[in-house]
Amino acid sequence: PPLAPLLPTEKGASLLIDCGANVDARPSHLVQFAKMGSIYMENVMGIRNPRVAIVNIGAEEEKGNALVKETFPLLKECKDINFIGSIEARDIPSGYADVIVCEAFAGNIILKLYEGVGATLISMVKKGMLSTLRSKIGALLVKPALKETLKRFDTSQYGGAPMLGLKGLVVKTHGSSKSTEVCN
């Protein structure tokens, strides 16, 4: 069963599947992840015909490691999903795909980078907004919109990641999660 957190994007959120449960996944596993992710985004998030992409080092079909090269044609042939091809890490925040498929090693790196960039961005913006009198005045004007935008990158807003493919509900959280995160 894969862990499938939602990542904030410019268009809303994308489901990253898998981010920590299956480091040594096989092509058949990634196809199953794509199907589960597509079903989740359609039935839970209300996205009709979700766009599914596989994490790769380039957009071209022939690029990637053995796992990606073996999985790509299987996803392409799969009639149950709306497979749009490869996605590079830099395109994830744009919301290019609704479901982002990968094995857990790559997925965990993507997730941790997202968390780190989010925390750093929040910290940098706060420091910048409080650095001069002029920026403090400007901060008062943009505070509501900025606060709402930055909140999407605050990991405490996301309680955890659902583990899909099980008969019951399982949500994995960080061991350091506080009550706010568990409630979300």
Where are these regions (language model features)?
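Glycine-rich phosphate/nucleotide-binding loop
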Residues: 1-16, 96-100, 104-183
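Glycine-rich beta-alpha junction loops
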Residues: 21-23, 56-61, 87-91, 103-107, ...
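Low-complexity, intrinsically disordered basic tails/loops
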Residues: 14-26
